[in-house]
């Protein structure tokens, strides 16, 4: 990993930019690094605006408290500030639960296992689970892995294909940085975008020119990278749309794109929602989050942004508005405690830590594409149609060692019965692989099963426990104010202490999980072996640090995984 450059640079170009390595962190905020005392002193007039920012003070309070009013996420008397669940676009281009290794060979087939494997990601969203799985493979693995990746969203599929083509066609040190910024940064350096376009555009346009088929006809194209292959089966129209995500010139100016981005991520009408998210965080984390929301560029806090002037065409597509809700956050797709492992000196630079972690993982992922035997196939289908479409395309059914279904089994989507009936038959038989596993995620089940009586019954215990972790601080704010930030903080954290097992068991009984499984020759695992049943839930007798990691992650602890295996 290359060292980070000294943070002594200025946006107005009024000073010469230091090209030395950043080795000395600011001890005030731990957000930036310098090559030495001279540069730190020279940069202080600029850095003090961040280091002394009121948001970094322990006494900082949200605007609704300072202005002594009802927060906008509660008040519905003003049309502009009517509480809504979402502001911004409706696409989910960044994961909202942490990535996990789909194989976990050590705890399943065994660390020395080297037979071929087949994986299905039926509603993949982004590529985080693929990346996590590939980088977690034991170095001794010698088999071939076949991976089918599907999503119904055009933008998700196009971005995933572009990222993988970059990994196949550019050296790992270049590809890893390019994928990172295409994935998470609103703006890119011109040189990076041209490298990507030069690698990806001809790979698609040349084969389309040689095969002029009708718009609805499915075209399959395969690329090779040493012993790995990448293919996609898309209609001609869908292939053309992939190319539209890499235009020769930007569809939109930097100024207009920045305004569109800020209209979602920094909307005035949503300031109370932002303050509610910022308030619980470590003071320097607040500023790291604010900077990312402000400029939309995933870099260390002190890194220069001056080259990042081209709108990311996979996010600003055909002059469309910012495609994601204002709650979208790259951090939610990764495990916070893994991101925060010591990696560089600016220890409170939260998004800088994420940058370091992602760059390392993506570099490893790109390297392993060159050494493993992988065959990756991309599809754009509704999950409900996917099994039939795959069988038609291949002329046979494909059976899998792992089937990952995201949360399509939630009641608001396909539901558990239909999901299991569609994908359960695709799991390999016990005599082929007794460890074959189908993985369902339920994000909304406990909320859907909870009644007002449940909520009333659980609140006293939750609030009593929370006094230990989130005590009211009478020196800051008015504790008698029912909209006191500490009190609302406690209410937000109460989900972490809810009896979710009881609520989820209601769904298991009402939806007749066991009966469904029995009909299909499947059973729910008593002990999950791929991903913990409640991976984001607090354990018994948590420490203050464990509570803070869970609360600051932005997750509720209600996320429940169910693993199914062949029985009988």
Task: Indicate where each model-derived feature is located.
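The −1 position to Zn-ligating cysteines in a subset of zinc-ribbon hairpins
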Residues: 5, 25, 34-35, 50
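Cys/His-coordinated zinc-finger cores
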Residues: 29-48
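Cys/His-rich Zn2+-binding "zinc-finger" mini-domains, especially FYVE domains
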Residues: 1-29
């Amino acid at each position: 990993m290359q060292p980070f450059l000294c943070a002594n640079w200025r946006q107005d170009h009024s000073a010469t930019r230091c090209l030395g390595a950043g080795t000395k962190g600011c001890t005030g905020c731990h957000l930036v690094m310098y090559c030495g005392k001279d540069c730190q002193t020279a940069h202080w007039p600029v850095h003090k605006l961040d280091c002394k920012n009121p948001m970094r003070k322990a006494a900082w309070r949200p605007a609704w408290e300072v202005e002594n009013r009802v927060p906008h996420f509660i008040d519905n008397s003003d049309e502009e500030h009517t509480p809504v669940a979402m502001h911004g676009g409706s696409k989910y281009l960044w994961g909202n639960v942490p990535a996990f290794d789909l194989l976990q060979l050590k705890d399943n087939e065994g660390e020395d296992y080297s037979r071929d494997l087949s994986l299905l990601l039926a509603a993949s969203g982004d590529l985080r689970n693929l990346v996590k799985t590939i980088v977690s493979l034991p170095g001794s693995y010698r088999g071939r892995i076949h991976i089918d990746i599907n999503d119904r969203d055009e933008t998700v599929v196009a971005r995933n294909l572009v990222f993988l083509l970059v990994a196949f066609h550019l050296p790992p040190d270049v590809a890893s940085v390019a994928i990172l910024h295409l994935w998470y940064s609103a703006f890119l350096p011109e040189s990076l975008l041209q490298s990507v376009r030069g690698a990806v555009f001809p790979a698609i346009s040349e084969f389309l020119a040689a095969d002029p088929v009708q718009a609805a006809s499915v075209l399959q194209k395969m690329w090779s990278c040493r012993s790995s292959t990448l293919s996609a089966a898309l209609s001609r129209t869908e292939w053309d749309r992939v190319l539209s995500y890499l235009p020769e010139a930007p569809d939109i100016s930097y100024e207009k794109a920045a305004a569109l981005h800020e209209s979602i991520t920094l909307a005035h009408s949503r300031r109370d929602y932002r303050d509610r998210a910022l308030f619980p965080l470590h003071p320097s984390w607040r500023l790291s989050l604010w900077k990312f929301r402000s400029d939309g560029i995933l870099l260390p806090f002190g890194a220069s942004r001056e080259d990042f002037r081209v709108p990311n065409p996979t996010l600003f597509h055909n002059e469309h508005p910012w495609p994601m809700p204002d709650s979208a956050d790259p951090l939610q797709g990764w495990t916070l405690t893994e991101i925060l492992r010591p990696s560089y000196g600016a220890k409170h630079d939260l998004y800088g830590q994420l940058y370091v972690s992602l760059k390392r993982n993506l570099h490893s992922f790109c390297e392993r594409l060159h050494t493993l035997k992988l065959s990756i196939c991309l599809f754009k289908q509704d999950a409900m149609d996917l099994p039939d479409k795959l069988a038609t395309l291949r002329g046979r059914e494909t059976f899998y060692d792992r089937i990952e279904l995201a949360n399509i089994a939630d009641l608001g989507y396909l539901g558990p019965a239909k999901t299991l009936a569609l994908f359960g038959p695709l799991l390999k038989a016990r005599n082929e692989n007794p460890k074959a596993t189908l993985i369902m995620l339920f994000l909304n089940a406990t909320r859907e099963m909870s009644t007002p009586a449940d909520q009333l019954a659980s609140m006293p215990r939750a609030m009593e426990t929370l006094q230990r972790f989130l005590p009211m601080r009478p020196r800051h704010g008015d504790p008698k104010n029912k909209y006191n930030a500490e009190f609302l903080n406690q209410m937000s954290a109460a989900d972490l202490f809810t009896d979710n097992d009881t609520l989820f068991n209601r769904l298991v009984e009402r939806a007749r999980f066991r009966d469904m499984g029995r009909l299909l020759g499947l059973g729910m695992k008593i002990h999950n072996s791929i991903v913990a049943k409640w991976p984001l839930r607090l354990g018994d007798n948590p420490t203050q640090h464990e509570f803070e990691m869970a609360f600051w992650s932005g997750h509720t602890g209600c996320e429940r995984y169910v693993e199914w295996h062949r029985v009988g």
